[in-house]
Amino acid sequence: MLNFVLRELTKKEILSLYKRFLTKFFAGNDESFLISEAAIKWLIARNLCRCYGLYDDKKHLLCFGLFINDVERRVMLLDYFIVLKKYRGYNYPEIFFEMLTEMSVDEAEKNDNESILLGIFIELAGIGDMSAKALDKRQRELEFYRKLGAYITDIIPEFSDEEYNVLFMPINARLTRLELKAEFLNIYKEILPSFKDKKKYIRRLTEEVDGLI
């Protein structure tokens, strides 16, 4: 039975992964989804970026997740999640998020609930005019995150022409609708210097209680 290790990566390791894997993964038509190396360095310098890697017992990197966080590190936004090509088709993503949850809960208990991770935001592409293939992929992603406890909120970012739905995966707290919006905005107001009018960027998607659909 394999023993897995999940750990937070250093600045040097993050930049190495960016060059070795992210640039290749998004090469071609998806390049617009990849932020620049300068942006990664900017986020790291301001402590607004964290990256975790899942390793097997032979220290092979299986997958990694790059997250953007607010200054207080109360919430994180999943920016990129990559499973290395030769390790795809296994349950490593589930193991990654389960171990990340366990790690965050343990840290909260040790810190007496001070500076704890409340949960993780996940942006999922809106349906729009998706092809049948893309729609099927989106549905599988949605089902994956739902199995981990995530749910669709009533937040829709309008930072570009692309529409996104925002999911929230509770870790140490289940937030109200107002708290969700406040925490989501806390992330973006740090990474968008011109972020001033929240109404310009956030609009209501549904009137369902607590953002559940």
Predicted regions span which residues?
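A short helix-loop-beta-strand connector motif used in the catalytic cores of GNAT acetyltransferases and
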Residues: 41-53, 63
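Feature marks short, surface-exposed loop/turn motifs that line or immediately flank catalytic pockets
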Residues: 71, 85, 128
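Residue-level detector of beta-propeller blades
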Residues: 8, 60-61, 151-152
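Conserved acetyl-CoA-binding loop-helix of GNAT-fold acetyltransferases
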Residues: 83, 89-108
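Short amphipathic alpha-helix that is part of the acyltransferase structural core
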Residues: 1-39, 55
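Terminal substrate-recognition subdomain of acyl/acetyltransferases
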Residues: 1-2, 109-213
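Conserved beta-strand in the GNAT
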Residues: 53, 59-69, 75-82
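A conserved beta-turn-beta hairpin within the catalytic core of GNAT-like acetyltransferases
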Residues: 70-78, 88, 114-118
